[in-house]
Each structure stands twice: as structure tokens, then as C-alpha cells.
Design a protein with these regions (language model features):
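A transmembrane helix-and-boundary motif of multi-pass membrane transporters/channels
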Residues: 1-228, 334, 338-341, 345, ...
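Extended, charge-rich low-complexity regions and/or helical-solenoid scaffolds
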Residues: 519, 523, 544-633
Length: 692
């Protein structure tokens, strides 16, 4: 028996299934009591809007209401205007859907749902009434009322019975990220790096990180306090820096071990103390222990005159990179504690860097535009086929094609998900036919109807809580509710049922085939484009810009990295290459930030470094692959380092130190494992980059 119950959903999932079913029946009963023409819309809306958590339910309710209202108003406006020219009406509907879909792709939070829904609500309302345009107002009004009813019931019932907050789930995700990040950092600190393990941990950290943005957007909808929401955003803004900071530290330590083994002994006690401190921060991160570790690190930092020696510069750079990681980790842990305790006290950062700023999402507008265009063209082609075939109920095929293309437009490879949509919709037709022709004829009152729905709907609703079942179960329950088309009186005709409801799977099958033809690229194309965007941004750094523009670009590059790494892993490419390219850009940004503070030969050489790095990546763009770093660039880096050490800049201690560390970091990112070299060492073979 224990084995049997092991696979059963937990009690809280069953509570959610019962609660959602009860809400759907309440919405259905009220809609029938008010004699609404399509009460099943209210029932289906409950399942669409509901979530196990208060925040997502509230936000989906709000944004679904906004999207439905906008789409209904568009239908009332466009249908009477273009009903005499059906082909033009089709183009207008397709453009409306595509434009709003394109706008929704710019948003990565829950509010994108409002725009996407407004886009496909127009065909949902407009296409069924093209033969009777005078009914468009009635249909738009009825759909709006019934959906608003379903939204209201779902929100009220969800808030009153067994409400769950999203905050504990957010805490669990943060703990998962920290568990991976702790092991990841520990492997590099102890110099026990296993490539497969590190790659797996990196992938887990990125996947967890990418789920946090949507959750952060939901927290205000369940009443999270403003300071807590600010802290979650600060935490995410620091999490995104950890991977490049650890990668830079690893390269600095590797170069130290390879070039100056005599200095490794001085570094070892600090690494051991840092590893011990890392383990101690699992439950708390007191500032006093962080300060003691920082003091130990600062005591090892060479003085300004010693940096003329490149071995001492290597040592100093390794200390600087370790200090960055220590400060960043302290901030992350202190923010985690503040979020968990819901502290409303102002939070104080210890990791301070000019590049820290508000997260700016990177958007590949080219792919977004193409995705919207493929949706527009799918709607137009499907509509033309419907008109030419003269299929009375073919509008349902166009509607579901529009819905499917919109739902999965943001995916690199939407075809498999559209096929799942098709499969579960086809199953819903089968389930609806069983109910409509075998079960409902034997029912004579509403309580019997509730009992007939109870077992399968509660079971399926319970399974929607689990991510692996969510899409299939939600489609099954929503489509079955819609296809049964429950109204005030039983009126079922098999031919009418088959004609109207088989159109949906046909439309989805068309959307699947169309997507295979129009979007066969998958993650490979997205990864390739993201690589080229990175190179273009590095080339663009040779152009004049303000510090604020550079800060925005740096944060945007970090966001792009979080999109790039999963795609590289999915296509079997080395994720370390993308990290190095990001570090090239970040070190260039540091050079550009501090270069205006120096004059003369050092300034000329710093400008030359930036220009030559830009030329190098311009050559990579032209070649279509990452080329070996040219020897001339490496010599320029070495000359610049010597100029900073020999032009009387020792008085500009902080500026000089930042520039030297940026040069060292840039060199290591371009050529891992090697530091500043003389001309005699430039004959050594340089590592090839990953082909584009």
C-alpha cells in the first residue's frame, strides 16, 4: 500500500482540485441562473484563471479581465466596419492578433497575458459572427460577462478557501539556487572542478534564476510588502552576477597556479578560510565574519609599487576577484535572510560596483517579429482555406490555430507543444462526446450534473498542480467544458457536435504543420543569434557612450547570458565560451569607465585596446566563428599594462588598480590560463573558440 500511495498527489493538491471544481460549479450555476447564453464559458474561465497560489490567481484574474475587455471592444469596432469584405476582415484580425502578440513578447511578467489574450480574443468573438454581424455586440457582451463572472468566482473562492501564498515557494526556489551555488562556488574555491558536475550545477542555477522573475512579479498581487519586493529584486540583480564573477575568479586562480606557483602558498590559507566561511553562511551571514575575512584578504593585497611586477599583479588580480565573490555572496545571503524574515528595515549592500543597475531585459526583436509574422500568416492562410472551403464551423479551426500560435510564440521550438495541444484537444472532443451522449441524457437536475462531473474534474484539476501534467490536464478540462456546451436545456445533435468540435483539432493540426514549416529552426538559431548579438555589443563599445548607457548595456548583457546558457546547453555547446565573451565585454566596460581619468600615453593605449578588441570581434562576425585572439592585441595589452606602471600614475592608486585589474581580466577572458606575456611567448598556439 505504501508503494501505491507514493505516487499520489499530496493533500494540498487535492484541496486545490476540490476548491477549483467547487468554484467552477458555482460559476456555472450562477451563469445558468442568470440565463447567460454560454454559461460554460464561466465554468472554463475558473480553470484558466485558478492557481494554487493567491498571487497568480489574482494577477491572472486581473489581466484576463483586461485582455477580454480589449478584445471584445476590438470585435465590436472591427466587425461592422469590415464585414462586407471578409478577406480584409481576416487581415485586420490577423494583424491585431500579431501586433498585440509582438507587444506581449516584450514583457516577461504576468502582464504579458493581458496583451496576448486581447490579441486572440478578437478572433474568438469575431469569427463565429461573420455571417451575422449584428450579433457581435451580444456575443462580445455575453463573453465579457461570463468571463468576468468566472474570474470573480475563482478569485473569491481561491482567497477564502485554503489560500496559499507564493512566498514560501519563492523561498524554496531561492534555497535551491543557493544549494547549487554553494557547491558550484566550493568546487572552484577548493580547486576541485569536475566539468560535468560544474556544467550541471550551472544549468540548474540558470534554470532556477529564470523562474524567479515571474514569481517576483506575482508577489505584490498577494500583498507582499514593498520592502520585501525590493529585496527580491535586489537579490535577483546580484544572483545574475555570480556566474561571471566565479568564472573570473577561476581564471585568475588558474593563471596564478600556472605562472606564479611560488605565490600559491600565500593564497592557500585565504582560500581555506573563504571555503569555511562559505559553509558557515548556510543559516546566517553576520557582517562581522564577512568583515574579518575581508580584512584577511586586504592584508595580502600588494602595495602600488609592487604591481610593476606582473607576478604581483596576477596575485593582486586573484585577490580582487576573490573579494568580488565574497562581497557578492554576503549580499546574496543577507538578502535571502531579509526576504525570509520579511524584514522591512532598509537593506545595506556590501558589494558595490558601478555596473550594478536595474535589470534590463534583452529582447531579440528579430525573432519576436518573425514569430508574430508567422502567427499572422497562419491566421490568414487558415482563414482563406476556411472561406474557400465554405465550412460553416471552420471558424473554430482558425480560432484554435490563432490561440496555439500565440500561446507558444515565445518558444524556440513551439511545434512539440502545439502537437500536445492538438492531442489533448482531440481527447477532449472524445470525453465531451461521452458526457454529451451517454451521461447527460440521464441527468435531470443540477446536483446530479455536479456529481457527474465531480470525480473526473477533481482528479484532472488536482493533476494541473504538477508542472509535468499542467498543460495536458488544463487543456483537457477547459476544452471538455467548452465542447460539452452546457446550457439551460439539454439539446444535443451528433452531426452538429462533430461538425463544430472537430474543427478545433483540425485547426491545431494545421497550426502544428504550419509551425514545422515556418519555424523549423529550434534553439540552434536562437543560440547563434545570441552569440552574434554579444559580438556586436562588444564591437559597439568602440563608439562613444555615457556611463549610464554602458551600465544599461552591462546589465542587458547579463540578462542575455541567462537566455544564452540554456540554449547552448540544449544544443550541446560549451557554455564557458559565452561566459568568457561576457567577461570580455564587462572588462571593456570597466576600462571605458576609468580611462577618462588618465591622460597621455596610457589613455592612448587604453583607447587602442578597446579599438583592437572591437576589430577582433568584428573579424569574428565576418568569419562567422570565434577566431584566435590576434598577437597584436595581446602585445597592445602588455604595452598598456607597462604604460600604467611607468607613467607616474602611482598617485592615482584606485584608478590605476581598477584599470590594471580590468586589463588582467580582459586578457584572461580572451586567452584563458595565460597572463601578460612578452613577445617571445606570443608564438604559443592560442585556443580555438567554439564555431558559430
Amino acid at each position: 500500500m505504501n508503494g501505491f500511495f507514493t505516487g499520489m498527489p499530496p493533500a494540498r493538491d487535492w484541496f486545490y482540485g476540490v476548491r477549483t471544481f467547487a468554484a467552477s460549479m458555482i460559476a456555472l450555476y450562477i451563469a445558468m441562473l442568470m440565463q447567460m447564453p454560454r454559461p460554460y464559458w464561466a465554468m472554463a474561465t475558473v480553470y484558466i484563471v485558478s492557481s494554487p497560489f493567491v498571487g497568480p490567481t489574482s494577477s491572472k484574474a486581473l489581466y484576463r479581465a483586461i485582455g477580454t475587455f480589449l478584445g471584445a471592444m476590438a470585435a465590436v469596432f472591427f466587425v461592422p466596419m469590415f464585414v462586407q469584405t471578409p478577406f480584409l476582415l481576416v487581415v485586420v484580425i490577423a494583424l491585431w492578433t500579431g501586433i498585440l502578440l509582438f507587444l506581449s513578447l516584450h514583457l516577461r511578467t504576468a502582464n504579458s497575458y493581458a496583451l496576448m489574450l486581447a490579441g486572440y480574443t478578437l478572433p474568438l468573438i469575431a469569427l463565429p459572427v461573420v455571417d451575422n454581424p449584428l450579433a457581435v455586440w451580444d456575443v462580445a457582451e455575453a463573453r465579457t460577462e461570463e468571463i468576468f463572472l468566472g474570474i470573480a468566482v475563482a478569485a473569491v473562492v481561491g482567497a477564502m478557501f485554503w489560500p496559499r501564498r507564493l512566498a514560501p515557494v519563492f523561498d524554496d526556489s531561492v534555497r535551491k539556487w543557493f544549494a547549487d551555488a554553494t557547491v558550484y562556488s566550493q568546487r572552484f574555491l577548493t580547486r576541485n572542478v569536475q566539468p560535468e558536475e560544474v556544467s550541471s550545477l550551472r544549468g540548474g542555477m540558470v534554470a532556477t534564476f529564470n523562474t524567479l522573475e515571474l514569481m517576483i512579479g506575482q508577489l505584490p498581487h498577494e500583498g507582499a510588502r514593498p520592502q520585501t519586493v525590493r529585496n527580491t529584486k535586489e537579490l535577483r540583480g546580484r544572483m545574475i552576477h555570480l556566474l561571471p564573477v566565479v568564472d573570473a575568479l577561476d581564471d585568475a586562480l588558474y593563471a596564478l597556479e600556472r605562472r606564479t606557483p611560488e605565490l600559491v602558498g600565500q593564497f592557500a590559507p585565504l582560500l581555506a578560510a573563504t571555503t569555511e566561511w562559505l559553509q558557515s553562511t548556510t543559516h546566517e551571514a553576520p557582517v562581522q565574519r564577512w568583515r574579518a575575512l575581508r580584512d584577511q584578504l586586504e592584508a595580502l593585497q600588494p602595495d602600488a609599487e609592487a604591481l610593476d611586477d606582473r607576478h604581483q599583479l596576477l596575485f593582486s588580480n586573484a585577490l580582487y576577484r576573490l573579494g568580488e565573490w565574497i562581497d557578492l555572496w554576503q549580499d546574496c545571503r543577507s538578502l535571502q535572510a531579509a526576504i525570509h524574515s520579511e524584514s522591512q528595515a532598509p537593506w545595506r549592500a556590501v558589494y558595490r560596483h558601478w555596473r550594478l543597475g536595474r535589470l534590463t531585459p534583452f529582447l531579440d526583436r528579430g525573432l519576436m517579429l518573425y514569430s508574430a509574422f508567422s502567427t499572422v500568416s497562419a491566421i490568414i492562410v487558415a482563414s482563406v482555406l476556411w472561406i474557400l472551403l465554405g465550412w460553416t464551423d471552420g471558424g473554430s479551426a482558425v480560432i484554435l490555430a490563432a490561440v496555439a500560435c500565440s500561446f507558444f510564440a515565445s518558444m524556440d521550438d513551439p511545434a512539440p507543444q502545439i502537437y500536445r495541444f492538438f492531442f489533448w484537444t482531440a481527447m477532449s472532443v472524445l470525453f465531451a462526446s461521452l458526457y454529451l451522449f451517454l451521461i447527460l441524457p440521464n441527468l435531470h437536475d443540477f446536483p446530479m450534473l455536479v456529481l457527474a462531473f465531480a470525480v473526473p474534474f477533481i482528479w484532472v484539476g488536482t493533476l494541473t498542480v504538477q508542472p509535468r501534467f499542467y498543460l495536458g490536464m488544463l487543456l483537457t478540462i477547459v476544452n471538455t467544458s467548452s465542447f460539452i456546451s452546457i446550457q439551460g436545456a439539454y439539446d444535443a445533435d451528433f452531426l452538429s457536435f462533430a461538425n463544430s468540435n472537430l474543427a478545433g483539432p483540425v485547426g491545431l493540426l494545421f497550426a502544428f504543420i504550419w509551425t514545422l514549416i515556418a519555424r523549423p529552426f529550434g534553439a540552434e538559431l536562437a543560440a547563434k543569434r545570441l552569440t552574434r548579438f554579444s559580438w556586436r555589443d562588444i564591437v559597439g563599445l568602440t563608439q562613444p557612450a555615457t556611463l549610464a548607457e554602458h551600465r544599461r548595456l552591462g546589465v542587458q548583457m547579463l540578462d542575455r547570458l541567462m537566455q544564452h546558457l540554456p540554449r547552448l546547453a540544449m544544443t550541446g555547446q560549451d557554455t564557458g565560451v559565452a561566459l568568457r565573451e561576457l567577461r570580455v565585454a564587462l572588462n571593456l566596460l570597466d576600462l571605458l569607465a576609468y580611462a577618462p581619468r588618465v591622460l597621455g600615453v596610457p589613455r592612448v593605449l587604453l583607447d587602442q585596446v578597446v579599438a583592437e578588441v572591437g576589430e577582433y570581434f568584428k573579424a569574428c562576425l565576418k568569419a562567422g566563428e570565434r577566431l584566435p585572439a590576434p598577437s597584436g592585441l595581446l602585445m597592445t595589452l602588455d604595452r598598456t599594462r607597462r604604460a600604467l606602471n611607468g607613467q607616474g600614475l602611482q598617485g592615482e592608486g584606485e584608478t590605476r588598480l581598477h584599470l590594471l585589474h580590468a586589463l588582467s581580466g580582459l586578457r584572461l577572458a580572451l586567452l584563458p590560463g595565460v597572463e601578460f606575456v612578452g613577445t617571445g611567448e606570443l608564438d604559443a598556439p592560442l585556443p580555438d573558440g567554439a564555431p558559430l
